[in-house]
Amino acid sequence: MKVNLDRTSSGFCIGVQGTIHLAEEKLREHDGKLYCLGDIVHNEVEVKRLEELGLITIDLNEYSALTNAPVLIRAHGEPPSTYTTAKSNQLDVTDSTCPVVAKLQRSARMLHNRGYQIIIYGKKNHPEVIGINGQCDNQAIIIKHPDLSAPEETAPLDFTRRTALISQTTMDVPGFAMLKENLERLFSASAGPGERHAASHWQDIRDIDLTAEITGVRPLPKFLYKDTICRQVSSRNSKLHDFAAQNDVVIFVAGKKSSNGQVLFNICKASNPRTYFAEDEKDIQDEWLLENRQPVQSAGVCGATSTPMWLLEKVARSIESRFSS
């Protein structure tokens, strides 16, 4: 059996990689004691490794009660209230918010402050979405289903307001496009005769367009969208699809809490039905890698943006050792 490890489209994205490096650095600085608000990464194996080095994962209630202590803000980002608490509690904060997420937060805040109704394509309880919504005074409308199949998600929409569609950085590009088209139809159907054209053709904007509005050079359109999906993440979709197709069996390694992991696993599964989900090498069942009681010719090992490369390598070595004979 040949074991193929995907090193180009799997493993930590830049944002998570930066957070992990900062955590290790701060743990050394603070003699092996550092608090992190929420799981530093949605991978239980990596969290356990860092906790063994001294990282202490805390929830919001524990964070609010903490004083004069070093705290790490993870790559997902946080709402403004988290920083207010840090200041009042004299916390030594290391902010490792992903630059892509930080840019998205600024866009959301600017559009909200200009009076826009903000729609976020994302998952309501995902920490990144909570942070983005916080930039909008927690007034954003969050839609997970691009086909608008959940009426409770669209019920709060005000069809008379200026409206902006943005996205959680790890959502899928086709879903974002579908949501935009469905919102165009929905707003057009609800608009008056004079508004139907604008409502049915939402405009794509760039950062320069936001600056033009703020400086008074030209106004933003009433209905707009800004594709804020991280391309480093989304570009993995097609690459992992191809990788999965090139192997007899695929072992996809990720944490069960990983939103990105679920998306990428489903992409691999669609490309190769013999794709199996594992958190680590202990989850792998021998029968996954057999065909007519013989080892398959090739097994691919890949993972999510929250899966460390050391874990992927460990899984690959485990498969090789189990089927080396």
UniProtKB/Swiss-Prot annotation:
Residues annotated for (2E)-4-hydroxy-3-methylbut-2-enyl diphosphate binding in this entry: H42, H76, H126, T169, S258, S259, N260, S306
Catalytically driven reaction(s): isopentenyl diphosphate + 2 oxidized [2Fe-2S]-[ferredoxin] + H2O = (2E)-4-hydroxy-3-methylbut-2-enyl diphosphate + 2 reduced [2Fe-2S]-[ferredoxin] + 2 H(+); dimethylallyl diphosphate + 2 oxidized [2Fe-2S]-[ferredoxin] + H2O = (2E)-4-hydroxy-3-methylbut-2-enyl diphosphate + 2 reduced [2Fe-2S]-[ferredoxin] + 2 H(+)
Cofactor note as given: Binds 1 [4Fe-4S] cluster per subunit.
Gene3D superfamilies, per database record: 3.40.50.11270, 4-hydroxy-3-methylbut-2-enyl diphosphate reductase, catalytic domain
Listed cofactors: [4Fe-4S] cluster
Residues involved in dimethylallyl diphosphate binding: H42, H76, H126, S258, S259, N260, S306
EC numbers, comma separated: 1.17.7.4
Listed name of the protein: 4-hydroxy-3-methylbut-2-enyl diphosphate reductase
Origin species: Prosthecochloris aestuarii (strain DSM 271 / SK 413)
